[in-house]
Amino acid sequence: MPDRAQVIIRIVPGGGTKTLQQIINQLEYLSRKGRLELQRSARHLDIPLPPDQIHELARSWVQETGTYDESQPDEERQQELTTHIIVSFPAGTSQVAAYAASREWAAEMFGSGAGGGRYNYLTAFHIDRDHPHLHVVVNRRELLGHGWLKISRRHPQLNYDALRIKMAEISLRHGIALDASRRAERGITERPITYAQYRRLEREQARQIRFEDADLEQSSPQGDHPEFSQPFDTSPFEASAGGPEDMPRPNNRQNESQVHLQEPAGVSNEAGVLVRVALETERLAQPFVSETILADDIGSGSSRVAEGRVESANRTPDIPRAATEAATHTTHDRQRRAKRPHDDDGGPSGAKRVTLEGIAVGPQANAGEQDGSSGPLVRQAGTSRPSPPTATTRASTATDSLSATAHLQQRRGVLSKRPREDDDGEPSERKRERDERSKDGRGGNRR
C-alpha cells in the first residue's frame, strides 16, 4: 500500500493586513483583478462576492474591529486585521473534491464555533499550479465576542495538529485520502526548510531553466540566423599560394580602396618611422584619402640611406612602384592645393616663407643625390634631424638648411624695427654727410 500524501495547511507568514488599503489589495490579488471568484462564508450562504463590492466589504471588516481609526497614519498601525491560510492538495486531485473539502474545512474551523469562535472569511480557489489549493482570508475579529483569532501550538482548538486532523477527516469524506501524522512519527528529525528558502530555490530553478533556454538558442544552427544565411562572397579577392604573394589582391578597380597593404618581409622596422603611401584610386573614390602605413627604417645618418630604404621598399613585389608614384603625385597635388596664393605685395611672413622654401628645395636636393653629386647641400641634409612621421613627402627628401638660413638672414633686414627709407625716398642726414666727405676727399681710409 503506497504512502498517503500529507495534509498541507500553511499559514502565510506576514500575510496579514493592517490597513484598509492592504485588505483591498489582498482581495484583488486573490481574485486576479476580478477574473476569479471570491466566495463568502457559510454565514452569508456561500454567495460569491462581485469585484465591485470588494471595497465595501473591506470597509465593513475594518469597522467590525471597533478599534480602527481611519485618521491614524498607516505606518503607526500594529494590529493585524486578517490571517491568510492556504490549504493544498496533492497533484492530480479532483478539483471538485478538493474545492468541496477545503470549503467544508473552512466552515468547520472558523464559521461553526468549533474552533472557539465564529469569524468572517473569504475563499479563492486556484488551479494555476499542479496542485489545487484554496486561499482563506479570515477576519481576525470574532463576531460574537471581543477576542482575536489566534492559531498556535498551545491553543486548545486552533492548533496545528487539530487543523491537520480535521482536514484529513473531511477530505476522506470527499474521497481524498490524506495523512495527518507528525514529522516525528514519520521518522523525520531534521528541521524543514522555511517557506522563504523554498521560494528562493524555486526562483533559482526557474532562472536556471531560462539560462539553459538561452544557451540552446545561441547554439542553434547557423541557418536559423539571418546573417549566417547570407553567402560570403570571396570573389573580390584572389589569393595565390606561396611566399609573400599570399596577400589578397583586388580583381577590380572599385575594391582597391578596401585593400590594406601589409608590411613586406624585406622592410625592417628598427627606427619606428612610418612612411605613408596613399593609393590614387582611394583619393578619386572617397572624399577622405585612405592611407596605408608602411613601417620603414629612416635613420639620422644621411638622406641617401633614407632614399635607399624607400627604394628597397618600392622594389618589393607587394607594393608596386606605380602605387608609390601615384601616392607621391597625390601628396604634391595636396600640398599645392593647401598653399594659399599670395601676390607680390602681400606675401606671407618670413617664417612661413622659410618653411615653404624649405619644402620646395626638397626635390632639388633629392635630384642631386640621384645624379651622384655631393655638394654642401647634401652634406648639410645628412646631418639634419629626421622628419616627423606625419609628413608624407619629407620622409624621402632632405631640406635645404643653408638656403633657408641665408634667406632668413636676408629677411631680417625687412623685419627689423629700425626704419629704412625706400629706394625712391630722400637720403638720410648721415648719408648726405658721408657723401659730402667723399666728395671733399676727407672720407679716406681710417687707421
From Swiss-Prot:
Residues 427-447 have a biased composition (Basic and acidic residues). Residues 251-260 have a biased composition (Polar residues). One of its GO terms (biological process) is symbiont-mediated induction of tumor or growth in host. Residues 390-406 have a biased composition (Low complexity). Residues 214-265, 300-447 are annotated as: Disordered. It is an enzyme of class 3 (hydrolase). Tumor formation by A.tumefaciens involves the transfer and integration of a defined segment (T-DNA) of Ti plasmid DNA into the plant nuclear genome. The virD operon encodes a site-specific endonuclease that cleaves at a unique site within both 24 bp direct repeats flanking the T-DNA. This is T-DNA border endonuclease VirD2. The lineage of its organism: Bacteria, Pseudomonadati, Pseudomonadota, Alphaproteobacteria, Hyphomicrobiales.
